[in-house]
Amino acid sequence: FCSAFLGYEKGIHAPGIADLGAGRRAAHHLLLAHGLALRVLNINSPDSLNGLVLNMSPTYPKSDCARDIEAAQLADDFLFQWYAQPVLAGSYPDKAMAHIPEHLRPPIETGDMAIISQPMDYIGLNYYTRGIFHAEADNAFVETVPTEAELTDMGWEVFPQGLTDLLVNLHKRYSLPPVFITENGVAMADKVVNG
């Protein structure tokens, strides 16, 4: 997510490219590299535990209106399930793929999805906050930052219930290997004491 989406699609991280097609191609090739690495690790270190760590946030609609509910579901598929579904179910989410113009979709070769979706010994999840989304005329989904909630110094909502919701939703959607919470918490202004 960080290198593909933030680096190639949004241009926030290195290499600073803001291009939907480049981001989706980078994501596909990262997932393909993961699958190829699993093969090598399983052959050369058969007793090791091998898996993948994903950044994920549950998505919620801003309101109960059908368009906002649909926007939140598309945001989940487009931002998070795009990385989870290939490794856990062997395909990209249909709604997310349909949201990408055909000429910007990643080139998926015969056999790619089988490589990507090899069984893993575990999956790691990095969770920090939830995403709240609504629909707008020009955009399928737009993220809303809640103004009434407690926010971290990074502007992320403090929302512990989101971790439970994320785990429950993933369990309903996929047959999961063992799950590890590999990152979570909040970023706040720390004071250095005696240091």
Segments predicted by a language model, with ranges:
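Active-site region of glycoside hydrolase catalytic domains
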Residues: 1-195
